Amino acid sequence: MRTSRGIAVRANALALAAATAVAVLAGCGSTGKNGVATKSTGAIVATAEDAVVAASSVHIQGQFTSGGEHVVLDLRLVKDKGASGTVTIDDEVIELLRIGPDVYVKGDEQFYRSVVARFGDATGPSPSGSATPTAPHASGSPGASATPKSSASTPGDITVSAMQVNYLHIGPTDAQYQTFASLTDPRQLVQQIMQGVGSLDKDGQKDIRGTKSIVLSGKKDTRVYVAIDGSPWLLRVLPPGGGTLEFLDYDKPVTLNPPPAAQVVDIAKIMK
């Protein structure tokens, strides 16, 4: 016959075992509500990439290294419509806008000098003491309209000061198109960011801006964070070359506005 003392000891042992089991399960982390955490790491990355592409909009902000160049992004991508924001490559700032197939770029003085040196007449005066006009931004972002100016028609007329108050239009048939358009395509941009990531391992969970995510770790401090609740969105990437990319504002309304026609210079005319 069991004594009351024996029953108490057994009950305490069972309670301790139960508490230990709960602690172990908590340490393993939950699989989340969207099931992505149960997949292989390769499948998780592919699912997150598809989620970025499927989103009606996404704001990508941060920096990384690509082809030896330091790239800083602040872009809002809109599904099937285009993108708006800024790209800085090795201290050269470019304001980028794509509406449908048409890409418009506006840069700082260094950017225009490089364009003029390649295609135009670099003898023209450069602006002094004036801030670089700001290209169109997504709604809710600061932006200033440039002073209207007729677009130049021949390379000899193209000067830094003339170009800096205009937008360069780059069409799908122009040689430079893919370079800029790839930055506004969600799948191409994510693949560029993820380039060189290599193999990844599951490395626990982390809360990213209030959303529970699974952490995938790789070489050179690479980290990929994917939401395990709700949509399996890509939330943050620490690429192997250094830097951090944040994926924000999924499915938030974004308005894209084309620049005034009078303020557009066709890059094809400069290259003639």
Feature-to-residue mapping (PLM):
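Bacterial N-terminal signal peptides that target proteins for export
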Residues: M1-L16
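C-terminal motif of bacterial Sec signal peptides marking the signal peptidase cleavage site
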Residues: V24-G27
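Subset-of-secretome marker
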Residues: G29-K272
